[in-house]
Amino acid sequence: MKNINITRKITQGMYALTTQNGGCIVDAVSQISFGKNPLISVAVMKNNYTNQLLKTNDKFAISILGKEVNPEIIKTFGFNSSRNINKFERVETTKIEEIEIINNSLGYMICEIVDSIDNDTHTLFIGKLIEADVFEDKEAMSYQYYQEHREEILKA
């Protein structure tokens, strides 16, 4: 028997994925290589508008969210479509390499898209790390922490 619930035990974080003209909250981000040109992967649901945007852009950014993140970031990027609103008008950002970075984050990674893989529900975008910085050395928010504290985070 295949018990898919075991996948919930895979450690994941909470991230704001941004590209030109939009972004969303993601949890499936991974460093897939080290060395001179590290590769970062991010999985984005196919029915998410940000997925469409990534297919027409050459870069994306990942802002790492901390446990003390401003709840507006999760509300704005997690429960609204960039097709309908300008998310960057609702949260404080800084533009780096033509991509908006979330100011109230632990840090960011900007990647140049080098490949993508489609499956039935998601597209895996693979990017070469071209710019990164750490803003704060605090604890990152895990997906498990978010699920366990979701109500209190979202009502703040």
Question: What do the predicted segments below correspond to?
Answer:
Residues 1-156:
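Basic, polyanion-binding surface patches
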